[in-house]
Amino acid sequence: ATFTIRNNXPYTVWAAASPGGGRRLDMARIWGRTNXNFD
């Protein structure tokens, strides 16, 4: 399977809930997030 991941938000996506106050997401993590908006 091939997954194409695109960050539509105009900034780097960070996992704010990670220990240490957040870290850069790697390709192994996929968030259901579009245009940097949360529902």
From Swiss-Prot:
This is Osmotin-like protein. The keyword Transport does not apply. Belongs to the thaumatin family. Keywords: Antimicrobial, Disulfide bond, Fungicide, Pathogenesis-related protein, Plant defense. It comes from Hevea brasiliensis. Gene3D superfamilies: Thaumatin (2.60.110.10). Contains intrachain disulfide bonds. The keyword Disulfide bond applies. One of its GO terms (biological process) is defense response to fungus. May be an important antifungal protein. It comes from the Eukaryota.
